């Protein structure tokens, strides 16, 4: 049940959660086979998260190896994965699971030296859980690029046989069946929507990954100038004009920043990066 409620006098009635499964399944008597292609990079952060204070308001005793916290977090990770797969199996038969995680060869750091450097140092427990995914859950390490690029590579081969599982908005630049396990939400992203999502991100960037390459250009501007029915050339022109506006008519800077944003945002098939 969703925590959102509606009230009638003193009675509060829970509003059922809609996971949107009806938008992608018409016959629930038939279970399609799906290959689950999972962006697992967020799981170590989610499963090791602790609030500053416990339920009684006391300072939290954070997980450490010494106090057995790493084992607790590993148990949470195992339960999280099992819970996600159980939810998927309510509607699909899981043929294969690919848990994808990042490696150490990311060309985006060569294209932009400050890429993701503004993030705080990764906690030891997150690194521990990352290794657990590899050692105990047979996670696939991206040999080049990021976990998202591994997913792109797999989906290029699998097509609609894949169920893309993750919470990163970058994944919504891929067409296909999607499951956001955090929101418990299914959707199908068609080619037009995926392309619109991609060019929107190129235009406004991603502050969680890299510096703002198009100053003062935000979501509202993107919604105003981009349209889902645009051709590729129309997208390029509209996005270029946005960068030109951001860099006050400086053609060279606008072109340079747009090309860089394109490279950073794009999910690459491994063959394109070799």
Predicted regions and their residues:
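Extended two-metal-dependent nuclease catalytic cores across DNA- and RNA-processing enzymes
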Residues: 2-24, 94, 117-274
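Domain-level signal for Mg2+-assisted phosphodiester chemistry and nucleotide/NA-binding surfaces
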Residues: 2-131
């Amino acid at each position: 049940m969703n925590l959102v409620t509606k009230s009638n006098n003193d009675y509060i009635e829970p509003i059922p959660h809609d996971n949107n499964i009806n938008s992608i399944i018409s016959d629930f008597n038939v279970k399609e086979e799906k290959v689950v292609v999972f962006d697992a990079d967020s799981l170590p952060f989610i499963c090791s998260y602790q609030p500053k204070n416990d339920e009684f308001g006391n300072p939290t005793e954070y997980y450490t190896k010494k106090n057995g916290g790493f084992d607790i977090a590993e148990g949470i990770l195992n339960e999280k994965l099992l819970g996600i797969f159980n939810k998927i199996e309510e509607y699909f038969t899981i043929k294969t699971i690919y848990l994808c995680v990042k490696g150490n060869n990311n060309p985006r750091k060569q294209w932009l030296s400050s890429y993701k450097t503004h993030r705080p140092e990764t906690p030891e427990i997150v690194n521990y859980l990352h290794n657990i995914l590899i050692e105990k859950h047979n996670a696939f390490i991206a040999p080049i690029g990021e976990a998202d690029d591994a997913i792109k590579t797999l989906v290029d081969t699998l097509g609609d046989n894949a169920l893309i599982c993750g919470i990163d908005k970058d994944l919504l630049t891929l067409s296909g069946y999607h499951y956001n396990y955090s929101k418990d939400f299914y959707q199908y992203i068609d080619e037009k929507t995926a392309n619109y999502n991609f060019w929107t991100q190129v235009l406004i960037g991603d502050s969680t990954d890299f510096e703002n390459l198009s100053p003062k250009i935000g979501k509202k501007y993107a919604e105003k100038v981009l349209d889902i029915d645009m051709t590729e050339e129309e997208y390029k022109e509209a996005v270029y004009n946005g960068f030109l506006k951001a860099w006050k008519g400086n053609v060279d800077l606008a072109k340079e920043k747009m090309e860089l944003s394109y490279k950073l945002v794009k999910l690459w098939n491994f063959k394109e990066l070799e």
